[in-house]
Each structure stands twice: as structure tokens, then as C-alpha cells.
Amino acid sequence: PPGSDVANLAVFGYDPQKYYTGRSPLEAVSMNVPLELTDTTFRTNLVTLSDAENYEDKVMVDYSSDEISTDEARELIKYVNEKLGCDEYEFFGGFSYRHLMVWHNKENNFSLTPPHDISDRVIGEYLPKDETILNLMKKSYDILKDHPINKEREARGLHPANSIWIWGNGTKPNLDTYKERFGIKGAVVSAVDLIKGIGYCAGLDVLE
């Protein structure tokens, strides 16, 4: 079955075979992250992995880190960007567990697994083949597992957001607006960056 990104593009009247360039670039539009045609974007989840010693042996415990609060999550993503971001790639905070990485001047030739597809599974066979992305994920575990926010979450009986999981890659979208296609205006209401991003690209008013 199609993912929510492909499905919602179709619901808005856009043929995914013509217009789909990935999930994360639509979310980037909603987050006001400027994109170049040469950028590749990635959805970056804050996930909970088990504490197995080797990263490859860890289990995907929770792809949403107990639906982590946006305030906590943005602080963690800010920390990840400070420690791991650089001129080549950078991280941007979104909402709850849903965040963004932009890799500048990088071809979009990745095959990546959504974390919600591997709940309760050992992650080894689903890890990215790209060494840079894999190393970012591994390093994120090292810097997040003992972060004070995660220690506080564990003390409250909540799952720690102890790793990033990079997936949902794509490139800058280019949708014809509703005004161009149909000569009409419209509006969209949503709490989700994906839907808001489609709305912005379609030239619709996005109501908060």
C-alpha cells in the first residue's frame, strides 16, 4: 500500500508518478527550510532502540519515542546538529519525533527503511548501506543515550529518544498550484508538516 505521502498527494489531485519527489522535502517546505535543487532531504525520526551492545543488534523499540514532546525533541535535535551537523549536512527540528536532515549537493540515490516498518525487530539488516548516514545514526546513539532529557524521560517511565533514524529521502518539490491548474484558491488545516507542505506547494492558505 502507498505511504501517507503518496496517498495524500493523490488526494490533493497530484499524480504521484509525475509529482512525487519524496516525503521529507514536502515536510521541509512546511518547516520553512530553504532547499536547492541539488539538495537531498531526509525525514529524521527520534527513535528508541534497545540497549544491545552493538548497534546492529539493537531492536527498534519505538519509532516515535513515546510520541516525545516537541520541546524535548527540538532540544535533542539541536544538540544532534551541534555535535554532528556541518556545512555538508544539517538537522532541523520539527514536531514530536518528526525532524529533518538536509544533505547539500548530494544526489538522491538512497534506499532507506521507514522505522515504523520494523517495530520490535533487530535493526541490523535494515540499516542504511551509505556509510555517512549509518555513522550519523550510530554517533547519535552515543551522544543521546545519556542526554539529561533522556535520563529525565526514563525516570518518568518514558522511552528515551536515544537515536536518530534517517529515511524518507527526496528532493525539492515542484507542484503546479491550484490557481494554475484550476483557477481556484483554497485552504488546508492540519497538524502534520507533510499535509501543510503539500498545501504550501499547491498555493493554498495553510491555517494554523
How would you label these PLM feature ranges?
Residues 3-8, 99-103, 174-176:
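Short, solvent-exposed polar/charged micro-motifs at secondary-structure junctions
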Residues 3, 38-40, 93-95, 158, ...:
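A short, structural micro-pattern
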Residues 1-77:
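Active-site nucleophile/metal-coordination loop of metallo-enzymes that catalyze phosphate/sulfate
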Residues 12, 45-49, 102, 165-167, ...:
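Residues in well-ordered beta-strands of folded domains
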Residues 17, 50-52, 107, 170-173, ...:
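Short loop/turn segments at secondary-structure transitions that flank enzyme active sites
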Residues 128-132, 149-208:
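Terminal, contiguous helix-loop blocks that mediate binding/assembly
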Residues 63-163, 169-170:
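Glycine-rich, mobile lid/loop segments that gate access to catalytic sites or pores
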